[in-house]
């Protein structure tokens, strides 16, 4: 079980857009700088999210991307499904089944875990994510990402 960089970076971008939701569009370069994601990769992710109506784009000098709906109406599951072409990719890292085929006990446990992950992703909205990050004080940590050069 793992999230690809597509989902990880996509969720980071959506988090940034959710923080700025009522303020209008956010430039790709500002998200790129804040989250340390290349502009070209970020544009690919945001274009994919745009095709699925999770974000909107605005052209021009003050343009950028914004959420197409409120943060409380977009779940993490919505984002992951778009970026992973469904949820199956999230569960692709199944444990080795061994030389005698799949172990039914492992398969049962793995299925339950996959179901719980889906439940959590589908029950957690972008608004929930923003509130949880703030509640835990992680927003301050995210604000102070330092780059050291030796």
PLM features per residue range, with description:
Residues 45-50:
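Basic amphipathic alpha-helical segments that dock to polyanions
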């Amino acid at each position: 079980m793992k999230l690809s960089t597509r989902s990880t970076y996509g969720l980071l971008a959506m988090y940034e857009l959710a923080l700025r939701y009522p303020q209008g569009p956010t430039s790709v370069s500002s998200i790129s700088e804040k989250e340390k994601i290349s502009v070209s990769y970020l544009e690919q992710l945001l274009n994919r999210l745009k095709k699925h109506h999770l974000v909107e784009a605005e052209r021009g000098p003050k343009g950028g991307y914004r959420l197409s709906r409120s943060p409380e109406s977009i779940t993490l599951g919505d984002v992951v499904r778009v970026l992973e072409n469904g949820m199956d990719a999230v569960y692709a890292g199944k444990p080795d089944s061994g030389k005698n085929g799949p172990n039914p006990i492992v398969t049962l446990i793995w299925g339950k875990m996959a179901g719980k992950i889906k439940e959590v992703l589908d029950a957690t909205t972008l608004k929930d994510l923003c509130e949880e990050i703030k509640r835990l004080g992680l927003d301050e940590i995210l604000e102070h990402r330092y780059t050291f050069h030796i």
